[in-house]
Regions:
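Bacterial N-terminal signal peptides
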Residues: 9-15
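An acidic-aromatic pocket/loop used at catalytic or ligand-binding sites
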Residues: 21-223
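C-terminal motif of bacterial Sec signal peptides marking the signal peptidase cleavage site
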Residues: 17-19
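Bacterial N-terminal signal peptides that target proteins for export
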Residues: 1-8
Length: 223
C-alpha cells in the first residue's frame, strides 16, 4: 500500500514537471516569436525611402517657336477674367528667382524672370474651370507652347525635395495649389531660340493660379 502511494506521488510529480517544461517551452517560443516580429518591424522601419525615378527632360524634342510674344507676362487671360493684381503686374514679377517645373519625369529648377498671380472672374461672371483651362491652352499653343504635363509630381519626388518645395510654396503662394503632389496642374514650355518660357497653370472650381518663368534653355540629358 505504501509502495502504491509512493508511486502515485512520483507520477504526480513527473506530470507537474512535464507541464512546467511545456509552459517554459511555450513561453520561450512566444518570446522568440515576439523578438522576430520586433526585428522584422525594425527592419521595415529602417528601410530607406524609395528614390523617385527621374526621366531627364529633353528640350530638343520641343520645336523652336519664333512667334511674337505679347508684353510680359506673355499670357493674356480670356474675356471675363483678370489677374488678381491686374493693376500691379510688375509687383507680381521678380527679375530673378528660382522656381521648379515638373516636366512629367523630372523636377527642373529654372532660374530667371518670373511672374505669378491668382486668376479671378470679373464681377457678374461665374468662374469656369473648363473655360479658363481651354482658353489658356489655346493662347499658349498659339505662341508655340507645348503642354508637357497635366499633373504635378508624385509623393516620392515631393519627399525628396520637401524643404525646397515648401520654401517655394511659401514664397509663391498664388500658385501653391499646383505644387501639392498628385495635383491637377498644366505645365507648358515655349521654346525660343535662346531661352525657354515655362507656364504652370492651376485651375480650381472658384479661381486659379499661374506661374510664368523665363530662363535659359535646359541642358540636354547626358547620353
Amino acid at each position: 500500500m505504501r509502495m502504491s502511494k509512493t508511486l502515485l506521488a512520483l507520477g504526480v510529480a513527473s506530470a507537474l514537471l512535464v507541464g512546467c517544461k511545456k509552459q517554459d517551452d511555450n513561453a520561450a517560443a512566444d518570446t522568440a516569436t515576439a523578438a522576430a516580429a520586433a526585428d522584422a518591424n525594425a527592419t521595415q522601419t529602417e528601410a530607406p525611402a524609395a528614390k523617385p525615378a527621374v526621366v531627364a527632360f529633353d528640350i530638343d524634342k520641343i520645336p523652336v517657336s519664333d512667334k511674337p510674344l505679347p508684353a510680359w507676362p506673355y499670357i493674356a487671360l480670356p474675356a471675363g477674367y483678370h489677374y488678381h493684381e491686374a493693376d500691379d503686374l510688375a509687383g507680381q514679377s521678380k527679375d530673378l528667382a528660382r522656381v521648379p517645373v515638373w516636366t512629367g519625369g523630372q523636377l527642373l529648377w529654372v532660374e530667371g524672370k518670373t511672374f505669378s498671380d491668382a486668376i479671378r472672374s470679373d464681377d457678374g461672371k461665374t468662374y469656369s474651370k473648363f473655360e479658363v483651362r481651354k482658353n489658356l491652352q489655346q493662347a499658349i499653343e498659339a505662341l508655340g507652347g507645348v503642354r508637357i504635363g497635366e499633373r504635378s509630381y508624385d509623393e516620392a519626388t515631393y519627399k525628396a525635395n520637401e524643404k525646397a518645395l515648401d520654401d517655394f510654396r511659401q514664397e509663391f503662394d498664388r500658385i501653391r495649389d499646383a505644387y501639392w503632389y498628385d495635383a491637377d496642374a498644366d505645365t507648358y514650355v515655349i521654346r525660343r531660340a535662346d531661352k525657354a518660357v515655362w507656364v504652370v497653370l492651376q485651375t480650381g472650381n472658384g479661381d486659379g493660379g499661374i506661374l510664368v518663368a523665363e530662363g535659359p534653355l535646359p541642358d540636354a540629358p547626358a547620353e
